[in-house]
Amino acid sequence: RNLKYMIDNYSGLKYDEFVVITSENYRGVFNKLQMFDIYRDGENLYFDLDICIYDKVPNLIRKDLTVLHAWWRDRAHTSFNSSIISWTGDQSHVYETFKKDWYYLQGKYYKGIDEMLEKDFDVKTYDKVCYSIQNNEYEPKNKDYSIMLFNQRQFMMEPGWSGWWSNYFLPR
């Protein structure tokens, strides 16, 4: 609910449909691959639920499959981050490839779908369109961006945390 609230109130984005994929058919982040099977046409824009949108977002719609370049983290992990994804048209081959041997691929790509997308698919990356709370937990809001990622620190979105970002969530 926070994501829809932030999109509707701060992002400036217009959309035809807002959907949260809740099917838990796979382990963790691999569930988000189902969106490539469900959405096979038109312009698509995906956001992880653990982000903060606090201002008008730039145009993130892309023709080619596009993810974030994870410029904020150690390269030893992966240089991709799938907290924001866009594509136009049919990218169902991503899900179909995963679905054929999902059990094996979940183990092979223990770092998650970022690693799988980077190693197995032709994926573009955005320029710097957001930043991570990683190493910025006590810093003021970065006015150079309109989106901050929590990157597995979603606990900081819970009541009791008093960072600047909580002002952009649904009133509690």
State each model region's role.
Residues 20, 45-48, 67-68, 123-128, ...:
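A structural signal for short, well-ordered beta-strand segments and their strand-loop junctions
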Residues 2-4, 24-26, 51-53, 71-76, ...:
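Short, solvent-exposed loop/turn segments at secondary-structure junctions
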Residues 1-29, 41, 151-157, 162-172:
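N-terminal anchoring/stem segment of glycosyltransferases
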Residues 89-172:
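Catalytic core and acceptor-binding pocket of nucleotide-sugar-dependent glycosyltransferases
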Residues 80-81, 144:
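A generic structural signal for well-ordered coil/turn residues at beta-strand boundaries
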Residues 11-13, 38, 57-63, 142, ...:
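Short loop/helix-cap segments at secondary-structure boundaries that form the rim of catalytic
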Residues 13-16, 23, 39-43, 61-66, ...:
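Short glycine/proline-enriched coil/turn segments at helix->beta-strand junctions
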Residues 28-79, 86-87:
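GT-A fold catalytic core of metal-dependent nucleotide-sugar glycosyltransferases
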